[in-house]
Amino acid sequence: MTIILKPGSVPLETLEKIYREGLPVRIDPAFHAGIEKAAARIAEIAAGDAPVYGINTGFGKLASIRIAAGDVATLQRNLILSHCCGVGEPLSENIVRLIMALKLVSLGRGASGVRLEVITLIEAMLEKGVIPMIPEKGSVGASGDLAPLAHMTAAMIGEGEAFYRGERLSGAKALGKAGLKPVVLAAKEGLALINGTQTSTALALAGLFRAHRAVRTALITGALSTDAAMGSDAPFHEEIHQLRGHKGQIDAGRALRTLLEGSAIRRSHLEGDQRVQDPYCIRCQPRVDGACLDILRQAARTLEIEANAVTDNPLVLSDGRAVSGGNFHAEPVAFAADQIALAVCEIGAISQRRIALLVDPSLSFGLPAFLTRKPGLNSGLMIAEVTSAALMSENKQMAHPASVDSTPTSANQEDHVSMACHGARRLLQMTANLNAIIGIEALTGALGVELRKPLTTSAELAKVIAALRAKVVTLEEDRYMADDLKAAAELVADGTLSGVISAGILPDLEA
C-alpha cells in the first residue's frame, strides 16, 4: 500500500501511519505542475545576473560571495558534503522514513524550486527501502536541521551511508543495489533539501504519538489502581468536570468513569467506607491526565501545521520572486516538544505515586505489603516501585525546556536558534521511561485487583488484565523480575493494553 500525500493537508493520522507502519509514500500527481513551475523559475534566476541567496551565492555568513554560473552544481554538492557533520548513533528507520516523507510534503508545495526528479528519487528510496544513515545529533534547530538533512541528501547523491535490507552501506552502493541512480543537484536543490525543520518535526511527532498512546494507557492503569486501592469513582462525576470546563479533564474523567463501570469491587464499598477522600493520585487523575491531554492536543495542532509547512529558504512566491525568509527557524517545534515533555513527565509522576500507594500497606486499604502474600520471605513488587521512581526522576530532569536555550552560531549570522532537534529527540527516551512506569503500574494494579478476589473488577479492566496475563503471569513467589517489567512496558508501547478497550472510551488527539 502506498500513501498518496496532498502537501499542505496531510493529517496527523496519516503521519502516524507512516511512522508506525513504514509505508511508502508519493506526492499526489496533481502537485507536479506546481513543483515543475517553481523549478523552472529557479533555473531562470540561476541563469540571470541578479544575486539570489543560495542559488548563486555562498551560504550563511558567506552569502555575500557571488558564485559563477559554471560552479552552481559544485556549490550544491559542496554544501551537502560540508554539512554532513552529524555525530552519535543513527536515527531509527521509522524516524528517517518520517523525515523523508515530511521533506516530500514540504517540497511538494511547489515553493522550493526543486525538480520533479528529486521528488521521485525520495519516493523511490522509500518504496525500495533505501534509508539514509542520519546521526542523531548535530542540529540546533535553525537554520533548519542542516546536519541531519545533509546526511539524508548525501545518500541521494551517492555519498554518505544508507541502510538497505539490513545492511549499512555506502550511499552509492545502497542506491545501486536498489536499482536507483544518484541525483546531480541543480541550483538551490541542495539548500532546499537540507534547509528545513523536518528532522525536529519528525522526532517531535514520534514523541507525540508515543505520549498519546501512553496517556491513554495511563488512564487504564489509573483505573486499575483505583479499583485495586478500593478508591472512589465519585470524583470522576461528569458534572464536576463540566463545572471546570477543560476539555482534557472532561474526557479523562469520562474515560475513568466508563472504565470502572460495573466493578464489583467498587460496589462493595459504596456504603460504610470510613474514608472521606482518596489521595490526589487517585482523586485528581482527570485533572492531571486531562491537563496533559490538553497540552498534547495543543502540540499536535502545532506539529500538524509544521508537518505541512514549507520551511526552506529562499522560497519561490506566487509572483515568481525568490525571497529570503526564516521559516527554517524551528521555534514552534521546540515549544511543542517542551509541551510534550511536560506532559510525559507528569503522566509518569502521578502514575508512580499510584504504584507507591499500592505497595504500601498503610495506604492501600488492606492489600499486603508490596503485593505479596508472604512479605518478608518475598519482596514482591518492592523494587519495581523503586525502578518506577528512578524513571520518574530521570524524566523530571529531562523535562527542562530546551527552547529556553540558545547560542549564536555561524559567525553570529545565525545568532538565535531553537534547539528543537534535541528537545524533540529526548522525547524518545522520556516516552520509553514512561512506558516502563505505566507498565509497572499495570503490574501493580492488576495484582492488586487479583488480590481483592472473590470481588471482581469491571468488564473493560478485566480485558486489560487478561491481555497482561497473556504475557506476564501473576506473581505468586519472587522471581526474576526484569523480564516482567520489559514485557509490561512493551504492552504499553505497542498499544496492546489500550487496544483491548472498547472503541470510544479512550480520548483521541483530535478533540
From Swiss-Prot:
There is a cross-link at residues 142-144 (5-imidazolinone (Ala-Gly)). Keywords: Cytoplasm, Histidine metabolism, Lyase. Its EC number is 4.3.1.3. GO terms for molecular function: histidine ammonia-lyase activity. GO terms for biological process: L-histidine catabolic process to glutamate and formamide; L-histidine catabolic process to glutamate and formate. It catalyses: L-histidine = trans-urocanate + NH4(+). SUPFAM superfamilies: L-aspartase-like. InterPro entries: Aromatic_Lyase, Fumarase/histidase_N, HutH, L-Aspartase-like, Phe/His_NH3-lyase_AS. It is found in: Cytoplasm. Pfam families: Lyase_aromatic. Pathway: Amino-acid degradation; L-histidine degradation into L-glutamate; N-formimidoyl-L-glutamate from L-histidine: step 1/3. The modification 2,3-didehydroalanine (Ser) is found at residue 143. Disulfide bonds: none annotated. Coiled coil: none annotated. It is an enzyme of class 4 (lyase). The keyword Lyase applies. CDD domains: PAL-HAL. One of its GO terms (cellular component) is cytoplasm. Contains an active site 4-methylidene-imidazol-5-one (MIO), which is formed autocatalytically by cyclization and dehydration of residues Ala-Ser-Gly. HAMAP family: His_ammonia_lyase. Belongs to the PAL/histidase family. This is Histidine ammonia-lyase.
